[in-house]
């Protein structure tokens, strides 16, 4: 068989022309330091800020400090298997978390991995943990109410869908209870809730999850947890992971309530990371960008325009104070970012007034426009009445004689305080709140002994459920008060047949 040189030449040329280079070019570096959730690597000259980096053992990190000689990396997850001299490579991606309906009812870590032992989560979508907040023209003003089921909040400091309302107070003043009750009250309200537990004890998170499950709230709730035993990078990233999951629903036109419990611990974790990365410390040793840490998170909560689906994210961030000091650094930062704050006071809590909301220091800057008409009418003067009662109460401790008008104000004030108390995990529908506040502001409780107020309230609801459910239905459907004569007659009929004279 003769060898044809021309055929061989043509074959080689054809193969050269069809050659597809199949190289996997990645930039790699060498780990020079590892410890406390932080790594430093040399050789990643083109790494981008916030880029996801992969270590040779499969662990991931995020580039935070881009310095002339090396890159400071925060490690997402366990860092015990990483050693100096290990290879770390760029991925060209930023950190993303799984999002979607499959997460609802599950407990996940900030990376979106399940930690509830109920198997894998089949999600198809991913969202970056850091995304720009909606711009001014992409937003709508807050106009729809978010009912928490707590009389003291819905009447005095109303919250609207798309609002950011800070819950601030010392430890053990009932901050988490307020948020859990708000989540329980969203049952049947077409809301998705996300509870982000940052730096909590695992036993505490387990208790909250069981509470949500017991009341059927886990059916519409995602729990994201970065417990106190986990490395600081996970505590730092947890709120951003939570809001990324929320944004997926918001841009589908759905409404989301997200609770950050609490941002004080996230700030402490970020301070720890910043100091380990050798960033210059500022006030209280926090880095200079700690304000931006929280502002870029909370600005992602919004009521978006109809062009973007008209969805919303309502945020309830928590801040823990020391001895009621709301003028501390992180507290004042978050107060200035949010649309109002609910201040919980330890002395009110200890004296049995729960939820322990200080009406004088609490404010809702945009929620008033979202309040339903009925609530506006019955609760309009409630805050001022409560403030003047507190002032008079302090004054009367000096034992001076009181005129009839002052005595009447004190009597009404005592009953107001009693009405605003509420048992744990028993949120009230708005129509019931309106009826009892109407009874209070129109003097129907003035002759009821203070000790009987809560019993009166329960009996009134039961009586209305049986005999005057049409009045509840009117408030539910029209969002306005029924005819005052009808309400007056109904409450009077209840009082006439009851023992509360």
UniProtKB/Swiss-Prot annotation:
An example Gene Ontology CC term for this record: plasma membrane
GO MF, one annotated term: proton-transporting ATP synthase activity, rotational mechanism
Membrane topology value: Peripheral membrane protein
InterPro entries hit by this protein: ATP_synth_asu-like_sf, ATP_synth_asu_C, ATP_synth_asu_C_sf, ATP_synth_F1_a_nt-bd_dom, ATP_synth_F1_asu, ATPase_F1/V1/A1_a/bsu_N, ATPase_F1/V1/A1_a/bsu_N_sf, ATPase_F1/V1/A1_a/bsu_nucl-bd
Source species, domain of life: Bacteria
Pfam family, one: ATP-synt_ab_C
Keyword tags: ATP synthesis, ATP-binding, Cell membrane, CF(1), Hydrogen ion transport, Ion transport, Membrane, Nucleotide-binding, Translocase, Transport
Catalytic activity annotation: ATP + H2O + 4 H(+)(in) = ADP + phosphate + 5 H(+)(out)
Enzyme class, first EC level, given as a word: translocase
EC number of this enzyme: 7.1.2.2
Site (Required for activity): 362
Subcellular location: Cell membrane
Residues that bind ATP: 169-176
Entry's family note: Belongs to the ATPase alpha/beta chains family.
NCBIfam families found in the cross-reference section: atpA (TIGR00962), PRK13343.1 (NF009884)
Function in brief: Produces ATP from ADP in the presence of a proton gradient across the membrane. The alpha chain is a regulatory subunit.
Subunit structure: F-type ATPases have 2 components, CF(1) - the catalytic core - and CF(0) - the membrane proton channel. CF(1) has five subunits: alpha(3), beta(3), gamma(1), delta(1), epsilon(1). CF(0) has three main subunits: a(1), b(2) and c(9-12). The alpha and beta chains form an alternating ring which encloses part of the gamma chain. CF(1) is attached to CF(0) by a central stalk formed by the gamma and epsilon chains, while a peripheral stalk is formed by the delta and b chains.
HAMAP family recorded: ATP_synth_alpha_bact (MF_01346)
This protein's name: ATP synthase subunit alpha
Protein's organism: Streptococcus pyogenes serotype M5 (strain Manfredo)
């Amino acid at each position: 068989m003769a060898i044809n040189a021309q055929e061989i030449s043509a074959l080689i040329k054809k193969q050269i022309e069809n050659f597809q280079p199949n190289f996997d070019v990645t930039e790699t570096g060498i780990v020079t330091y590892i410890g406390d959730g932080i790594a430093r690597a040399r050789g990643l000259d083109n790494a981008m800020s916030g880029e996801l980096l992969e270590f040779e053992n499969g662990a991931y990190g995020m580039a935070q400090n881009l310095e002339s000689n090396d890159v400071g990396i925060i490690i997402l997850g366990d860092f015990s298997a990483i050693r100096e001299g290990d290879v770390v490579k760029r991925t060209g991606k930023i950190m993303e978390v799984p999002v979607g309906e499959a997460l609802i009812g599950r407990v996940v870590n900030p990376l979106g991995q399940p930690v509830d032992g109920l198997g894998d989560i089949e999600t198809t979508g991913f969202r970056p943990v850091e995304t720009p907040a909606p711009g001014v023209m992409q937003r709508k003003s807050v106009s729809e109410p978010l009912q928490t089921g707590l009389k003291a909040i819905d009447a005095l400091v109303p919250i609207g869908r798309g609002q950011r309302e800070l819950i601030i107070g010392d430890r053990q003043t009932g901050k988490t209870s307020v948020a859990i009750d708000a989540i329980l009250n969203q049952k049947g309200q077409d809301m998705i809730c996300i509870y982000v537990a940052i730096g909590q004890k695992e036993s505490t998170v387990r208790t909250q999850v069981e509470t949500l499950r017991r009341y059927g709230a886990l059916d519409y709730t995602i729990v994201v947890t970065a417990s106190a035993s986990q490395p600081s990078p996970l505590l730092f990233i947890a709120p951003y992971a939570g809001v990324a999951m929320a944004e997926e629903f918001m841009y589908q036109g759905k409404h989301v309530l997200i609770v950050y419990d609490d941002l004080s611990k996230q700030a402490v974790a970020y301070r720890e990371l910043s100091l380990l990365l050798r960033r210059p410390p500022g006030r209280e040793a926090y880095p200079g960008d700690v304000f931006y840490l929280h502002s870029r998170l909370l600005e992602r909560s919004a009521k978006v325009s109809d062009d973007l689906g008209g969805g919303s994210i309502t945020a309830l961030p928590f801040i823990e104070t020391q001895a009621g000091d709301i003028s501390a650094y992180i507290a004042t930062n978050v107060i200035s970012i949010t649309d109002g704050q609910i201040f919980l006071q330890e002395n009110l809590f200890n004296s049995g007034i729960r939820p322990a909301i200080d009406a004088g220091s609490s404010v809702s800057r945009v929620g008033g426009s979202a309040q339903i008409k009925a609530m506006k009418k019955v609760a309009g003067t409630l805050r001022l009445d409560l403030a003047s009662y507190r002032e008079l109460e302090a004054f009367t401790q000096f034992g001076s004689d009181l005129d009839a008008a002052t005595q009447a104000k004190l009597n009404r004030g005592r009953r107001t305080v009693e009405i605003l108390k509420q048992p744990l995990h028993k949120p009230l529908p708005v129509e019931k709140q309106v009826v009892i506040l109407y009874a209070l502001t129109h003097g129907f409780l003035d002759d009821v002994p203070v000790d009987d107020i809560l019993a009166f309230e329960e009996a009134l609801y039961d009586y209305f459920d049986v005999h005057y459910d049409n009045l509840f239905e009117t408030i539910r459907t029209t969002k306005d008060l029924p005819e005052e004569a009808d309400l007056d007659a109904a409450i009077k009929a209840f009082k006439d047949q009851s023992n509360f004279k």
